[in-house]
């Protein structure tokens, strides 16, 4: 057997209210960059399904920028570490790692010749540094600020200039190399959030939380204009700006939920207004080629349409909290993913477009979800089970409230029956209401219902599998199976009804004969940490497993010694795996991404 990565369904940018989101543009015009968790996400601007993820930061990444040559990317993280790495090779070999600041890096700017960088953020000793790209040697001092620097930029034409904007309400001007402080621009009255030179180097725009934008001369740093409206250029703070490639226009985005295009003299040309609550505040922007991008607090990436300002040309959604569960609808071919923040998305696997389920849903982490006919059954840490119609996907008014926190959910296909295990009971729901509750002396961890709906397997903290018969809504315990050395973490019945597989905290994976309830296959202990999820192929022969060790394995029941390992499928751990079709596996994990893999026998 062999495997190949098919598609990456990327996470959305990590966001924090009141902090700008920095997007990095590709000098060749093909890709754009952002960060989520410890990862840097590289996405094709025209086809977002073409993506790559760089995982090598030890701390959450905060910003990434392409070198103008296009051959390297510089990325920074919360610890003040800067990594410069190769973009031309799939492995992204590291050029250099430098501890530049003692606190978070907020922004990075390259010189036009790709030889120098300015790195800014927070720290105890300094708020910024100007360095050579290949050695980290200093090429000047970024001084003159009394508080953390939020943004910086490098003039793309000679003579080189550097500008920084900080929380001390001022933008500082530097000339070099070596770069030295020249003067400060002090007309902002609140934090600066973004400073950007126009591509031709003639002008600079500075924006801040005072709702103002000032235009400075690109050679001297002297004020030459301002965005029309003064303190009312936007109704709330401006978080980001980005110039058009021809330097004649500039895009700004604001917490007032609008994006605006201005000419190079500050005259307003176009307004893009968004509706919604706080989550619709716009925090990031990028103008690359003919594509204008804006990012909101929710992490959604909008492609703005200048010809139709009322409707974005495209909206990219994803998770920016770890993905906890997956479910697949074989009828519609839609994939459903639930995350730690209670969000459930419906994915079109062909286009890569995700749509959130409408309405008010779970308020906390989605523990598990499964498709039953034309509805999605999900359980959450919020102590509810929800039955969500899928045509169209719309949350019902309320879910079924449970007495304690649900651990797992399973459904009887073809019947209106769902089984949920809580911390101390096994609950059968019918018609979306609790029909019976069976108190147990053990602590359940996982549940599955057999293909014919007659049997329920409950895995437990006592390292056992408790087998129940299911008649109507009544459960009767039939057997207790032992053999596992750790508590149960995953169970699944084979589609042909002849077997079931189980996995535990201690990495063991067993295949059981359903009729005799004897172990048929054992010895699958190749994972290095707890197995979190397992699923059967429709052929009832191959099993896929995911683990906290970050790996995905595919096993063969007919040839137990035969397996393939997808190493580091999701950095940090795999939370969910399933089969999309007989040759495609989907996986999700702590990196907030979903990936599909082609499996060849």
Curated annotation (Swiss-Prot):
Domain of life here?
A: Eukaryota
User: Which family does the UniProt entry place this protein in?
Assistant: Belongs to the WD repeat AIP1 family.
Q: Which GO terms describe its biological process?
A: actin filament depolymerization
The name this protein carries in UniProt is 66 kDa stress protein
Repeat is among the record's keywords: yes
Q: Which UniProt keywords apply?
A: Repeat, WD repeat
Gene3D superfamilies linked to this entry: YVTN repeat-like/Quinoprotein amine dehydrogenase
InterPro entries, per the entry: WD40/YVTN_repeat-like_dom_sf (IPR015943), WD40_repeat_dom_sf (IPR036322), WD40_rpt (IPR001680)
Query: Mind telling me which PANTHER family this protein's record contains?
Result: WD REPEAT-CONTAINING PROTEIN 1, WD-REPEATCONTAINING PROTEIN WDR1
A GO cellular-component term linked to this record: cortical actin cytoskeleton
Start-end of the WD repeats?
56-95, 100-143, 145-184, 187-226, 233-272, 318-357, 435-478, 483-522, 526-565, 569-600
Free-text function comment from the UniProt entry: Associated with the process of cyst formation.
User: Listed GO molecular functions?
Assistant: actin filament binding
């Amino acid at each position: 057997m062999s495997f190949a990565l098919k598609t990456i369904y990327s996470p959305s940018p990590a966001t924090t209210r009141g902090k700008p989101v920095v997007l990095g543009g590709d000098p060749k015009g093909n890709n754009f960059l952002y960060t989520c968790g410890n990862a840097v996400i590289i996405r094709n601007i025209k086809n977002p399904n073409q993506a790559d993820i760089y995982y090598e930061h030890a701390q959450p990444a905060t910003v990434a920028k392409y070198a103008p040559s296009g051959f390297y990317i510089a990325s920074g993280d919360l610890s003040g570490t800067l990594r410069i790495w190769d973009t031309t090779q799939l492995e992204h070999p590291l050029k250099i790692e430098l501890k530049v600041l003692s606190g978070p890096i907020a922004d990075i700017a390259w010189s036009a010749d790709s030889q120098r960088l300015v790195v800014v953020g927070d720290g105890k000793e300094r708020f910024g540094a100007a360095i050579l790209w290949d050695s980290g040697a200093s090429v000047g001092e970024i001084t003159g600020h009394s508080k953390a620097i939020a943004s910086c930029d490098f003039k793309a034409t000679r003579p080189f200039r550097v500008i920084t904007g900080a929380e001390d309400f001022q933008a500082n001007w530097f000339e070099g190399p070596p770069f030295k402080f020249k003067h400060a621009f002090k007309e902002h009255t609140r934090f600066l959030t973004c400073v950007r030179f126009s591509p031709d180097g003639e002008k600079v725009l500075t924006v801040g939380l005072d709702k103002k934008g000032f235009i400075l001369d690109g050679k001297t740093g002297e004020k030459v204009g301002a965005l029309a409206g003064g303190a009312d250029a936007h109704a709330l703070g401006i978080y980001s700006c980005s110039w058009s490639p021809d330097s004649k226009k500039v895009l700004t985005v604001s917490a007032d939920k609008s994006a605006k295009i201005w000419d190079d003299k500050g005259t307003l040309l176009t307004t893009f207004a968004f509706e919604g609550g706080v989550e619709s505040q716009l925090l990031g922007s990028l103008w690359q080629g003919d594509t204008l991008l804006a990012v909101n607090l929710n992490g959604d990436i909008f492609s703005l349409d200048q010809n139709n300002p009322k409707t974005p040309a495209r909206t990219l959604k994803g998770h920016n909290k770890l993905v906890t569960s997956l479910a697949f609808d074989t009828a519609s071919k839609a994939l459903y993913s639930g995350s730690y923040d209670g969000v459930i998305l419906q994915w079109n696997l062909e286009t890569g477009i995700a749509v959130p389920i409408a309405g008010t849903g779970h308020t906390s982490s989605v523990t598990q979800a499964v498709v039953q006919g034309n509805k999605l059954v999900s359980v959450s840490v919020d102590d509810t089970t929800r039955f969500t119609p899928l045509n169209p996907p719309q949350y019902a008014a309320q879910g079924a409230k449970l007495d304690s926190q649900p651990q797992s959910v399973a459904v009887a296909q073809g019947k209106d029956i769902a089984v949920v295990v809580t911390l101390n009971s096994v609950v059968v729901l019918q018609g979306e209401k609790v029909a019976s509750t069976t108190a147990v002396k053990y602590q359940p961890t996982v549940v599955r219902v057999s293909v014919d709906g007659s049997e329920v397997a409950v895995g437990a903290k006592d390292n056992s599998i408790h087998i129940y018969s299911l008649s109507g809504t009544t459960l009767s315990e039939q057997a207790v199976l032992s053999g596992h050395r750790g508590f149960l973490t995953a169970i699944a019945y084979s589609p042909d009804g002849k077997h079931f597989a189980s996995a535990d905290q201690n990495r063991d994976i067993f295949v059981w004969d359903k009729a005799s309830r004897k172990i048929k296959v054992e010895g699958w202990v190749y994972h290095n940490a707890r197995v979190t999820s397992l699923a059967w192929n429709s052929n009832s022969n191959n099993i896929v497993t995911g683990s906290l060790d970050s790996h995905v394995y595919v096993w063969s029941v007919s040839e137990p010694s035969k397996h393939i390992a997808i190493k580091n499928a999701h950095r940090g751990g795999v939370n969910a795996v399933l089969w999309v079709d007989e040759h495609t596996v989907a996986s999700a994990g702590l990196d907030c991404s979903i990936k599909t893999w082609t499996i060849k026998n």
